[in-house]
C-alpha cells in the first residue's frame, strides 16, 4: 500500500516424498487385493471339499482391505484451504534470505545476533504465514484475472481468498484484527497509481489495454505483508513493468541496517529512469513517481512513520535492526507526480487519534464498529457494507473531519498516462535481510 510523501507520514512441499509414499500405498493395496483373490479361490475349493467330508474345517476369514492413506492436504482452486492446515507444525516457508552488505557482514556470524534472531521466531512465523497466504492468493489471481471481469469481482475474489487462507472471515467482532485482510485490495488502473478499490455499485470492467496495479495485504496478528504487482494483457507495456520491477529489486538490494533512506531513493531512481517505453509510436521515458514512497510497517499499522523515497535527495533517516519495510516503487509515462482524484474508498483510524467529543450519534456508532472490527487496520466502504452498516457516509466524513479517521483518496498522474507498481515486504533481521513476500512470480 502506497505512502504519499506529502502526507503524514520451498513453496509448499506437497510433492516429493508424498508421491513416493502414495506409490508405496498403491502397491500395498494391490498386493492386498491379490491376497484377497487367492483367499477367495481357496475358500471355494475348501467349500467343495467340505461338502464331501462335512464341515470339518472352518472357512478362512476374508482379510479386510487396507485403506489408502490420504496424502498431504493440497490447496483448492479457488484457494480456500487455510494455510495453517497445509503447515500443521506452524513452520512456514522462509522468504528470500540475503546477507547484509559491506560493514554489516559481521551480523551473519555474530553469536549474539544469531541468538536474537532465534528469539524472534514467533514474530517471523506470523510474517511467513501471512506471506504464504499472499503468494498462494496472488498466484491464483494472476492465472485467473482476465479482461471482461468487473473490478468488484476481482477485488472480492482476492479478499475472499485471503480471508479463507488466514482462517479469519472478519464477520465477528475482533476477528479481522486477529488475521485476514491487512488492507483493502487496490486495483488501480492506468494513470491511477494507488489507493483505488471499487465502492458498492461500481461497474468498472477490466479492459484488454489496461495496466492494473494489484496491491493487497494479508496479516496474522497484525503482522501485515504488503506486496503488489502489475498486470497487463498487451506486451507493449513490458518495458514499463521491467523498469519498475528492476527499481523495486534495486531498492531491496540497497536496503539494510543503518542505510540512509536517501541513498536507497537515489539507487531506485537511477534504475527506474534508465528505461523507456514505446506506446503507439511514441517513446516515453519511465519516470519515478517522486511523491510516492515505500514505508515501514508496525503491528496493525500499515504506515509506521518512516518513508522510503524512490527519488534522490531528502530523508537522511536510517533503517534500523528489527524493522519491517514495504519497498515499493512506481513508474509512470506521465509527469511522475500524483494528485488526489476520484471517489475515496480507503480509510484507516489514526494510531494516535485525538480525543474528540463527537456530536453525531452516527459518528459515535461507526467509530465503535471501526474500533471493534479494524482497530488501526485500513478498511474500505465495502467492508462496512459487509458488516451490515448502512447510511454511514455522514458519520464517516465527520470522523475524517475530526482527525480520528484518515482518508486515502486515489492517487493519479495525468490522464492518458500509464503507471506501474511492484512491492515487497522485507524484515531486517539481526543476522540477515529476509524478503518475506518473495515468490517465483516476482
UniProtKB/Swiss-Prot annotation:
Which domain of life, per UniProt?
Eukaryota
UniProt lists compositionally biased (Acidic residues) regions at 30-47
In the UniProt record, the signal sequence range is: none
* Molecular function GO terms recorded: initiator methionyl aminopeptidase activity; metal ion binding; metalloaminopeptidase activity
Q: Which reaction does it catalyse?
A: Release of N-terminal amino acids, preferentially methionine, from peptides and arylamides
Output the SUPFAM superfamilies linked to this UniProt entry. Answer: Creatinase/aminopeptidase, Winged helix' DNA-binding domain
Cofactor binding note: Binds 2 divalent metal cations per subunit. Has a high-affinity and a low affinity metal-binding site. The true nature of the physiological cofactor is under debate. The enzyme is active with cobalt, zinc, manganese or divalent iron ions. Most likely, methionine aminopeptidases function as mononuclear Fe(2+)-metalloproteases under physiological conditions, and the catalytically relevant metal-binding site has been assigned to the histidine-containing high-affinity site.
**What Enzyme Commission number(s) apply to this enzyme?**
3.4.11.18
Q: Which portions of the chain have biased composition (kind: Basic residues)?
A: 56-72
> Where is it localised?
Cytoplasm
Q: Which keywords, in A-to-Z order, does the entry hold?
A: Aminopeptidase, Cytoplasm, Hydrolase, Metal-binding, Protease
Which cofactors? Co(2+); Zn(2+); Mn(2+); Fe(2+)
Which residues of this UniProt protein bind a divalent metal cation 2? 226, 295, 328, 423
The record lists a divalent metal cation 1 as bound by 215, 226, 423
The top EC class is: hydrolase
Of the GO CC terms on this record, one is: cytoplasm
For this entry, list what GO says about its biological process.
Answer: proteolysis
Q: Where is this region: Disordered?
A: 1-92
Q: Where is the composition biased (Polar residues)?
A: 15-25
Q: Where does substrate bind?
A: 195, 303
Protein family membership:
Belongs to the peptidase M24A family. Methionine aminopeptidase eukaryotic type 2 subfamily.
Q: What does this protein do?
A: Cotranslationally removes the N-terminal methionine from nascent proteins. The N-terminal methionine is often cleaved when the second residue in the primary sequence is small and uncharged (Met-Ala-, Cys, Gly, Pro, Ser, Thr, or Val).
Per its record, how is this protein called by name?
Methionine aminopeptidase 2-1
